[in-house]
C-alpha cells in the first residue's frame, strides 16, 4: 500500500502522492522512508500520542483534555503535522506501534474516528488459556511445548527452567534436538521426550489471519526427515488417529458448511474462506482514558533501552539461518552480530570518538582514522545495567536515535542453535566463538519492548564489529538523486544532473527514438558513430516472412528509489536463486562477502558539521547496486582471458571456466559489484576453508547433503579463484526463451512476452520497485520506467552506458514543518559540494542541474 501511493512521474500524479510522518526512537526502514521524522524516546511516545489526539480532537471541535506530563517535544512539529492530518480528513490515518500502552491505542482510535479513518476492529473470541505465571504458581503434571524456544526467549522474570523441571513429564515438539536448541536440551535434562517437528512447508494445517479469516496451510514438499506436525501431536493427545489432512478437511467442512471436494479445492486455490473473518465492532465506544500519560525523565544516568527483533535472527528463531545472518542490517549494515546502538549525543557524553566514516558533507571533509585497524571497525565495549541485571556488547554510533535511547537487538547470544547461531570453531578445539550477545535478561513480562532507568559504562575493552558498509555519505555526488514534489512540479527533468543535464542532443535521425532505444544504439555525447545493429538474426532465410519478429531482444532493468524500502529481500532472493555462498564472519571482516546485490544506505544531513561530528537527525536513502550490464563495460576491456564478454542480448556475461582470477575486472569496475571466490566457499563450511584439498571428509560433505538440496540446478556452482557477479538471472531468460519457442511452434513468433521473465530480485521485491524486460520494446514496463522523467543512470559521466537505470526518489515535503527545507538534504549536499571539491579532486564533481545554483 505504501509503495502504491509513492509512484509519480508527472506533477498531477505527484499531487496525489501520500505523505508519511514517523515518530520513533530508533531508526527503522519506515522512518527512513518518511517525509518527516521526529526522534522521540519509546517511553515518551504514548504521551506524544495523547498530545496528537488532543490536538486533532481540538481542531475538529471535539476537545478532550488528556493528562500529559514530562513531554519535551517541538510544539510546532506537532501542530503542523496535526494541521496536515486534519486537512486530509477522510484520507488520513494514525497508526500506533504494538509496543505502546493500551491507553495510547485508545486515544489513537479516538483520533482516527474523528479523522474519519476507515479502521475496522475485529471482535476476537476470548481464549481459555493461562499464562506461564500460572504454571509457576501451579506446576503442570504434563508440560507440552509446541514449537518456540521459551528456555531462551521467555521473559527474564519467568523462571522457565524451574517450570519445566517441576513437571512430571515434559513433551517437546521442536525443529532442533537437544544439541541445537535450549528448550529441547532443557526437556531432555528434565527427563522429557523430544519429537521432531515438520516445517510448515511440509505440513497440512490451517489458521486465522489478523482479522480472523480462515486460511489453509498446505505442504509444498515431502518431509525431508521423519517428523510430526502440531496437529499430529494434539490429535494423539486427544486420542484421534486421523491424519492432519483429514483434520483440516473436517474443520473446513464445519466452517464452510459443506463437504464438497470442489469447495475444498477452491479454498486451497484462493487461500481464504470468504466470510470467515471475525465480526467487526460496529459501535466502538471508547471512553476517554483517565490514566495520566507521563513521559519519564531521561539522562545519561537514566537511559532508555529499546528492545527490537533483529533483522538477522528475528527473536532468535532464525539465528541459525546463514542467509539472514550475512544479510546486512538495513540501517547499521552490521552482520553476524548485534551491537549497542547509541545516538551521537550519547556517544559524545561517553567520550566515544566517531568511527572512520565520511560524514561531513558541507565544508571540508574530516576523517578520524584511529578507529579502523586493517579495514575493520573497532568498537568500544560497554556494559548496560538495570535493576541489577547487566549485558555487555560493542557500541555502535547510529544517527537518528533519540538522544537518550539505546537500541538492542534480540535473537543473538544463543548457547545452542547450530553451526550458524553459535559459530562453533572446530579449529579452536570446538570453542564457541560467539555470535552477538543475549539481551533477553532485559525483557520482562512488564517491560516487553523497552526499559527505563538504565545505566551505561565503558569497560575499557574493544572488539572488531562485522560491518559491510563503512562509507556513510555520497560526499555530495549525484549517485542517488532525490527531489521534492515541488521540484517535479517546477522542473520535470530535475533528476538530470551533471552530464545528464548538459549532454548535447542525440545525433540526427536518432532524435525521435525512444529513450530505451537510444540507450542501446546511440552512444552518449552527440557521436556520429553507432554500434552495430544486433537486431537482425543471421538465419532470415529459414524464417522468411517473419523478419520483424526475429529481433534479438535486449534486456535491461529499472529500479525505482521512490518505492524501495531497503528491506533486503532482493539480496537474499538473489543469494538463493544463484547459489551464492555464505562465507562467515571472519571472511566478511576481510571484505570477502559474495552478495551480487549491494544495498547501499546513505545518510544525508545537508548542514555544516563541526569537526567529525555525526549528524543527529539525517535523512536516509537506499540504493540497490548490482552489475549494471554496461554497454561499454570497463571490465570487459581488461580481462586477459576473455572470461567476461558481451552477448548479443546486451548481457555482460561470465564464462567461469575461462576465468583465471586476475581480478582486473573488479579493479576496473566503477560500481564495485564483482565478487571473487578467494576460497572454496561453496564446497566447504566455515572453519574448514583453509584445510586444502586433502582436508578431512567432514569438511567437504554435509552429513544430510542439505546444501546440495538447496542449490539451484540451473545455476553453476563456482569454485575458488573464480570471479562472479549478477547475470540478470540468465537462466530465467533462457527458460522463458525456450518456453516461447515451444509455444510458437510453426508460427515463428518466438519473442518473449513482456512480464514473462521475472528476475529473482524483482520477484521477491514486496514494493514492486524493480522492472525487468526488453528495452527495445517501447511498450514494455521497463521501457516505460526508463522513459520516466525521473530516470537516470549511475556514474554515466564515465560513458559506461549501464543497462540498469534508476528512478529518482521523491519526498513529499510539508514546507510548513519546522526546519523543513525546500530541497531534500541530499540535494543540499550536492549544491554545497563545491566548497570541498578542490580538497577531494574535481574529477568526479557533479555540475548543478539546470536552473539551480550550486551555491545556496
Enumerate the predicted regions with their spans.
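Iron-sulfur cluster-binding cysteine motifs and their immediate structural context
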Residues: 569-588, 598, 632-658, 664-682, ...
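A cross-kingdom feature strongest in bacterial/archaeal respiratory oxidoreductases
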Residues: 1-33, 118, 124-129, 133-224, ...
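Surface-exposed intrinsically disordered loops and tails
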Residues: 356-373, 686-707, 739
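Long, compositionally biased charged/polar accessory segments in the mid-to-C-terminal portions
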Residues: 699-707, 711, 721-856
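Surface-exposed acidic, glycine/proline-enriched linker/cap segments
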Residues: 216-217, 536, 598-623, 690-732
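Non-catalytic, well-ordered alpha-helical segments in soluble enzyme domains
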Residues: 228-254
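A glycine-rich, hydrophobic/aromatic-adjacent loop/helix-cap motif
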Residues: 85-137, 305
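Long, well-ordered, tryptophan-enriched scaffold segments
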Residues: 2-99, 113, 240
Amino acid at each position: 500500500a505504501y509503495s502504491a501511493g509513492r509512484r509519480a512521474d508527472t506533477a498531477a500524479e505527484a499531487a496525489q502522492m501520500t505523505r508519511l510522518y514517523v515518530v520513533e526512537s530508533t531508526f527503522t526502514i519506515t522512518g527512513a522512508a518518511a517525509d518527516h521524522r521526529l526522534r522521540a524516546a519509546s517511553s515518551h511516545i504514548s504521551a506524544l500520542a495523547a498530545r496528537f489526539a488532543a490536538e486533532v480532537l481540538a481542531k475538529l471541535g471535539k476537545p478532550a483534555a488528556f493528562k500529559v506530563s514530562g513531554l519535551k517535544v517541538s510544539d510546532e512539529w506537532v501542530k503542523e503535522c496535526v494541521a496536515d492530518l486534519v486537512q486530509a480528513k477522510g484520507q488520513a490515518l494514525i497508526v500506533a506501534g504494538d509496543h505502546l500502552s493500551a491507553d495510547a491505542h485508545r486515544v489513537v482510535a479516538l483520533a482516527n474516528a474523528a479523522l474519519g479513518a476507515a479502521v475496522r476492529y475485529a471482535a476476537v473470541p476470548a481464549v481459555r488459556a493461562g499464562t506461564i505465571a500460572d504454571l509457576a504458581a501451579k506446576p503442570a503434571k504434563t508440560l507440552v511445548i509446541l514449537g518456540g524456544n521459551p528456555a531462551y526467549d521467555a521473559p527474564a522474570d519467568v523462571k522457565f527452567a524451574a517450570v519445566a523441571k517441576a513437571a512430571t513429564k515434559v513433551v517437546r515438539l521442536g525443529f532442533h534436538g537437544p544439541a541445537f536448541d535450549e528448550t529441547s536440551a532443557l526437556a531432555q535434562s528434565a527427563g522429557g521426550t523430544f519429537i521432531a517437528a515438520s516445517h510448515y512447508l511440509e505440513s497440512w494445517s490451517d489458521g486465522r489471519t489478523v482479522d480472523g479469516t480462515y486460511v489453509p496451510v498446505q505442504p509444498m514438499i515431502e518431509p525431508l526427515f521423519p517428523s510430526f506436525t502440531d496437529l499430529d501431536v494434539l490429535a494423539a493427545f486427544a486420542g484421534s488417529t486421523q491424519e492432519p489432512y483429514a483434520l483440516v478437511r473436517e474443520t473446513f467442512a464445519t466452517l464452510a458448511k459443506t463437504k464438497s471436494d470442489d469447495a475444498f479445492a477452491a479454498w486451497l486455490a484462493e487461500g481464504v474462506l470468504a466470510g470467515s473473518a471475525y465480526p467487526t465492532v460496529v459501535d466502538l465506544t471508547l471512553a476517554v482514558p483517565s490514566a495520566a500519560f507521563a513521559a519519564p525523565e531521561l539522562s545519561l544516568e537514566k537511559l532508555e533501552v529499546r528492545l527490537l527483533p533483529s533483522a538477522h535472527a528475528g527473536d532468535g528463531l532464525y539465528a541459525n539461518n546463514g542467509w539472514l545472518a550475512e544479510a546486512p542490517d538495513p540501517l547499521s549494515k552490521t552482520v553476524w552480530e548485534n551491537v549497542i546502538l547509541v545516538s551521537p549525543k550519547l556517544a559524545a557524553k561517553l567520550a566515544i570518538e566517531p568511527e572512520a566514516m565520511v560524514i561531513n558533507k558541507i565544508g571540508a571533509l574530516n576523517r578520524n582514522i584511529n578507529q579502523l585497524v586493517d579495514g575493520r571497525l573497532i568498537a568500544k565495549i560497554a556494559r548496560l545495567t538495570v535493576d541489577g541485571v547487566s549485558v555487555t556488547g560493542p557500541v555502535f554510533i547510529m544517527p537518528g536515535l533519540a538522544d537518550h535511547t539505546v537500541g538492542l537487538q534480540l535473537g543473538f547470544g544463543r548457547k545452542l542453535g547450530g553451526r550458524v547461531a553459535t559459530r562453533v570453531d572446530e579449529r579452536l578445539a570446538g570453542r564457541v566463538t560467539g555470535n552477538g550477545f543475549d539481551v533477553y535478561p532485559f525483557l520482562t513480562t512488564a517491560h516487553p519492548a523497552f526499559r527505563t532507568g538504565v545505566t551505561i559504562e565503558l569497560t575499557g575493552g574493544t572488539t572488531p564489529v562485522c560491518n559491510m558498509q563503512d562509507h556513510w555519505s555520497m560526499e555530495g555526488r549525484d549517485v542517488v538523486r532525490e527531489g521534492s514534489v515541488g521540484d517535479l512540479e517546477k522542473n520535470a527533468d530535475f533528476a538530470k544532473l551533471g552530464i545528464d543535464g548538459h549532454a548535447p542532443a542525440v545525433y540526427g535521425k536518432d532524435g525521435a527514438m525512444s529513450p530505451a532505444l537510444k540507450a542501446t544504439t546511440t552512444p552518449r555525447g552527440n557521436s556520429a558513430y553507432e554500434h552495430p545493429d544486433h537486431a537482425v538474426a543471421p538465419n532470415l532465410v529459414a524464417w522468411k516472412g517473419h523478419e520483424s519478429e526475429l529481433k534479438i531482444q535486449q534486456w535491461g532493468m529499472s529500479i525505482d528509489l521512490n518505492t524501495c524500502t531497503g528491506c533486503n529481500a532482493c539480496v537474499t532472493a538473489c543469494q538463493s536463486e544463484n547459489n551464492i555462498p555464505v562465507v562467515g564472519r571472519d571472511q566478511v571482516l576481510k571484505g570477502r562477502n559474495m552478495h551480487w546485490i549491494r544495498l547501499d544506505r546513505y545518510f544525508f544531513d545537508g548542514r555544516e558539521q563541526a569537526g567529525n561530528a555525526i549528524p543527529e537527525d539525517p535523512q536516509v536513502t537506499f540504493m540497490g547496486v548490482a552489475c549494471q550490464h554496461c554497454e561499454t563495460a570497463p571490465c570487459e576491456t581488461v580481462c586477459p582471458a576473455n572470461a567476461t564478454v558481451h552477448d548479443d542480448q546486451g548481457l555482460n556475461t561470465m564464462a567461469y571456466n575461462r576465468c583465471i582470477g586476475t581480478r582486473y575486472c573488479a579493479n576496473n569496475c566503477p560500481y564495485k559489484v564483482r565478487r571473487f571466490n578467494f576460497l572454496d566457499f561453496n564446497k566447504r563450511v566455515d572453519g574448514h576453508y583453509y584445510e586444502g584439498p586433502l582436508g578431512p571428509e567432514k569438511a567437504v560433505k554435509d552429513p544430510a547433503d542439505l546444501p546440495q538440496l538447496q542449490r539451484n540446478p540451473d545455476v553453476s556452482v563456482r569454485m575458488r579463484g573464480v570471479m562472479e557477479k549478477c547475470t540478470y538471472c540468465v537462466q530465467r531468460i533462457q527458460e522463458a526463451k525456450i518456453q516461447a519457442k515451444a509455444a510458437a511452434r510453426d508460427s515463428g513468433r518466438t519473442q518473449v512476452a513482456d512480464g514473462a521473465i521475472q528476475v529473482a530480485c524483482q520477484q521477491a521485491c514486496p514494493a514492486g520497485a524493480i522492472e525487468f524486460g526488453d528495452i527495445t520494446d517501447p511498450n514494455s514496463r521497463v521501457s516505460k520506467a526508463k522513459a520516466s522523467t525521473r530516470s537516470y543512470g549511475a556514474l554515466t559521466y564515465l560513458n559506461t552506458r549501464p543497462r540498469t537505470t534508476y528512478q529518482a526518489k521523491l519526498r513529499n515535503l510539508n514546507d510548513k514543518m519546522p526546519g523543513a527545507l525546500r530541497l531534500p538534504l541530499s540535494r543540499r549536499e550536492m549544491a554545497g559540494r563545491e566548497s570541498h571539491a578542490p580538497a577531494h579532486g574535481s574529477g568526479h564533481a557533479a555540475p548543478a542541474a539546470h536552473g539551480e545554483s550550486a551555491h545556496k
